[in-house]
Design a protein with these regions (language model features):
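N-terminal secretory targeting modules
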Residues: 1-80, 84-91, 101, 134-137, ...
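Short, flexible loop segments at the rims of nucleotide/cofactor-binding pockets, characterized by
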Residues: 54-57, 117-121, 169
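Alpha-helical cap/lid subdomain in secreted, periplasmic
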Residues: 9-16, 125-274
């Protein structure tokens, strides 16, 4: 009889521990979602972001007017990236939607928060790029120089020698070169990479330098928001309005700060390459 009672007590203890662990995991995932837009509860972050001044209704896509004339008019643009392309801190609205509305473009937005250029798993840039429709028509392919590779200390690698056809996609440089080559061979359209606006990060600065070296090799476009001193010379008041944190813009940041600069570059680059 005592053995039966002991077994019941052990079963109850195990059940309580498992239940407590399950509650802890759920609460932790909710915290991750609310604070860092990560995991199955990532949508909870919108509760926080919707109250930011820079995400006010006046900055919504619905209130943006289409430009009278645009070199991008009617184009289909593919965007590949992570949280900044996704609009993680701006209620899932980024420069993608603003460019589309202002310039009458269609688009494919392949963006997943927290993902990397370096090919490690099904959500990496490369894996998701390879899942895109190979028969689609893209007029231009725009790719984000991911801050996640810098934050996660991914290997930078080095630019390959001329004539190289196989790339080390477990490094940032190799992944970038692979993406450029794959896009060119698959969709035969111009490739443009864009950087974040400036934030303090030696690894990301090194990635920007490497990207410019790759630009010289392949003739791709690079929208360099990182080292553009004039672009980054904004007031503290503007920065508070435009950025949810050091990396992620608000709707206002995309609409008033990033989008015009990106459009300016795309107009010129596409004019020379299409």
């Amino acid at each position: 009889m005592s053995n039966v009672k002991s077994k019941k007590k052990i079963a109850i203890i195990i059940s309580c521990v498992c239940a407590g662990l399950a509650v802890f995991i759920v609460v932790w995932l909710m915290i991750c979602g609310y604070l860092w837009t990560w995991g199955p509860f990532s949508g909870m972050a919108n509760l926080r972001f919707k109250n930011l001044q820079g995400n006010g209704e006046q900055y919504s896509v619905e209130n943006v007017e289409e430009l009278d004339e645009s070199p991008l008019n009617g184009m289909n643009i593919c965007y590949l990236g992570s949280s900044v392309t996704y609009g993680a801190s701006s209620l899932q609205t980024s420069f993608v939607e603003y460019i589309a509305k202002r310039n009458n473009t269609t688009y494919v937005k392949e963006a997943v928060s927290g993902t990397t250029l370096v090919d490690e798993g099904i959500n990496s840039y490369i894996s998701r790029m390879q899942s895109l429709d190979k028969d689609a028509h893209f007029d231009v392919f725009v790719c984000q120089l991911s801050t996640n590779d810098a934050t996660q200390n991914k290997a930078l690698g080095e630019v390959s020698a001329d004539g190289t056809t196989e790339f080390d996609t477990h490094t940032v440089c190799g992944a970038i070169e692979y993406i450029i080559t794959y896009v060119t061979q698959t969709w035969n359209c111009p490739v443009v990479f864009y950087t974040n606006s400036y934030y303090q990060s030696e690894p990301y600065a090194a990635m920007v330098d490497a990207l410019k070296e790759i630009q010289q090799k392949y003739g791709i476009g690079v929208i360099d928001l990182y080292t553009d001193e004039e672009f980054n010379d904004i007031s503290d008041e503007q920065r508070s309005l435009y950025m949810a944190d050091d990396i992620h813009p608000t709707k206002a940041g995309y609409l008033e700060w990033w989008t015009p600069k990106m459009e300016e570059y795309l107009y010129d680059f596409i004019g020379q390459n299409i």
